[in-house]
């Protein structure tokens, strides 16, 4: 498996997109390590992908879903989470950040393999890098169609079975503030690479099904127009937008420093991005909902946005709520 550093990744993406060659890419959180391969050269034993209806998975190599499914997370103690939370929130109260995405790594006991999770998960975006990780993400990073770039930051989660769940989510002041901040950040990000940037849909609700029930999430759509020659510069465009604002915070550079210090683990490809270019259009995802294989054991990486209105108990519970597989 060939991996590229930042400079060579930009060159490779520009080269392939400029020639209209279909390819898939994975870029890690620190955007210093990338997998880039033409679609007709991808070995399915190495990489399986699904971007909407675009996939290299063939049902001839299907796996049998274990029954019953064993899924037993062991979250870090609340006291440990609280320490990282206070480190982040203190920076927010000092004015160093307005929004910070704090994440954790959680061991999970399961009878599911990476292939099992890829094959049987219900998600818009799925990635399985053999012996490394599987991702089943609901979140789009950017889409590009006919020169229009669109982003869909996703912020705000609630259990769908709660009374008035949708109303509670939309009326939650903390969620409102977090969503407004990330919308402003992404709008500014897109303005670095596009013009006529605008918010076309604000805080719309999607329903997701998990192995432990349904959840509601709010997203916003932001669009802009790219220059006519964007294909030749697709690599530069992508890397200028990294890391993704929805999984870092605002202001992005300082907040990234804050969360790296507080988290005390390597995100790796978690919260990086993955994308599929078909020769004309691009679809890409933020790699959240992420299970990693380390020394034969599974680890789930999850987190959430911290603002000045956040409290540690609620954020800890949200982090745990996201430790699921969408298999049902």
Enumerate the language-model features and the residues they cover.
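Extended alpha-helical targeting/anchoring segments
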Residues: 1-328
């Amino acid at each position: 498996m060939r991996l590229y550093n930042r400079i060579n990744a930009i060159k490779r993406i520009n080269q392939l997109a400029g020639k209209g060659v279909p390819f898939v890419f994975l870029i890690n959180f620190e955007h210093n390590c990338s997998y880039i391969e033409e679609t007709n050269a991808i070995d399915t034993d190495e990489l399986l992908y699904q971007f909407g209806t675009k996939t290299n998975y063939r049902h001839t190599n299907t796996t049998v879903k274990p029954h019953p499914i064993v899924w037993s997370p062991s979250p870090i103690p609340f006291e440990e989470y609280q320490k990282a939370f206070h480190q982040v929130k203190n920076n927010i109260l000092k004015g160093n950040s307005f929004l910070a995405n704090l994440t954790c790594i959680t061991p999970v006991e399961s009878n599911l393999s990476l292939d099992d999770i890829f094959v049987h998960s219900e998600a818009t975006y799925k990635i399985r890098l053999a012996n490394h990780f599987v991702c089943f993400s609901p979140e789009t990073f950017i889409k590009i169609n006919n020169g229009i770039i669109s982003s869909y930051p996703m912020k705000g989660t609630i259990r769908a079975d709660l009374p008035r769940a949708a109303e509670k989510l939309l009326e939650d002041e903390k969620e409102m503030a977090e969503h407004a901040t990330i919308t402003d950040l992404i709008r500014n990000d897109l303005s670095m690479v596009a013009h006529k940037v605008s918010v076309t849909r604000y805080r719309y609700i999607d329903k997701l099904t998990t192995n432990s029930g349904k959840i509601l999430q709010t997203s916003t759509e932001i669009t802009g127009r790219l220059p006519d020659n964007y294909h030749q510069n697709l690599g530069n465009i992508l890397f200028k937008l990294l890391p993704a604002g929805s999984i870092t915070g605002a202001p992005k550079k300082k907040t990234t420093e804050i969360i790296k210090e507080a988290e005390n683990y390597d995100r790796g490809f978690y919260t990086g991005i993955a994308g599929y270019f078909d020769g004309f259009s691009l679809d890409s995802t933020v790699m959240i909902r992420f299970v990693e294989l380390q020394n034969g054991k599974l680890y789930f990486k999850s987190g959430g946005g911290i603002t000045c209105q956040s409290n540690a108990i609620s954020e800890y519970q949200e982090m745990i709520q996201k430790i699921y597989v969408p298999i049902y």
